């Protein structure tokens, strides 16, 4: 049964590979280049574009975020959290956010 599945899957994968090669030749974005080796890819920095801030909001509070270039994070001042930006892509999963108000919490705990 497994070999029959493999026999049916192999031609489909070959067709898919052929189609993707053809599509790669004809569906090219003007001005875009394909990187053939890793060193060329490593030279291109992945930076966050602040223009994206008009579309992004905090997933928890739905409030606008502020871009902090020094830490490369998107900050929600209201909640005191910061979302990391990795390779130019904001990681806006709430569990990935770090708190920015640790000092304030410590001060409140120390005061009687």
Swiss-Prot record:
SUPFAM superfamilies per UniProt: Trm112p-like
Chief localization: mitochondrion
Presequence boundaries: 1-34
Gene Ontology annotations for the cellular component aspect, listed alphabetically: endoplasmic reticulum membrane; glycosylphosphatidylinositol-N-acetylglucosaminyltransferase (GPI-GnT) complex; mitochondrion; plasma membrane
Domain of life: Eukaryota
TRM112 domain location: 49-95
Coiled coil: none
Keywords: Mitochondrion, Transit peptide
Compartment(s): Mitochondrion
GO annotation terms (biological process): GPI anchor biosynthetic process; protein stabilization
Pfam families, per database record: Trm112p
PANTHER family, alphabetized: PROTEIN PREY, MITOCHONDRIAL, ZGC:162634
Function in brief: In mitochondria, S-adenosylmethionine-dependent methyltransferase chaperone that supports both coenzyme Q biosynthesis, by stabilizing its components, such as COQ5, and NADH:ubiquinone oxidoreductase complex (complex I, MT-ND1) assembly, by stabilizing complex I assembly factors, such as NDUFAF5.
Quaternary organization: Interacts (via TRM112 domain) with NDUFAF5; the interaction is direct and stabilizes NDUFAF5 protein. Interacts with COQ5; the interaction is direct, stabilizes COQ5 protein and associates PYURF with COQ enzyme complex.
Family: Belongs to the PREY family.
Protein name: Protein preY, mitochondrial
């Amino acid at each position: 049964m497994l070999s029959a599945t493999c026999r049916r899957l192999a031609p489909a994968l070959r067709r898919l590979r052929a189609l993707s090669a053809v599509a790669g030749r004809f569906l090219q974005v003007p001005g875009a280049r394909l990187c053939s080796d890793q060193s060329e890819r490593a030279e291109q920095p992945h930076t966050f574009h602040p223009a994206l801030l008009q579309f992004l909001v905090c997933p928890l509070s739905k409030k606008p975020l502020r871009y902090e270039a020094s830490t490369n994070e998107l900050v929600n001042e209201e909640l005191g959290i910061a979302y990391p930006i990795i390779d130019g892509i904001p990681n806006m999963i709430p569990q990935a956010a770090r708190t920015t108000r640790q000092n304030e919490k410590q001060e409140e705990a120390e005061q009687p």
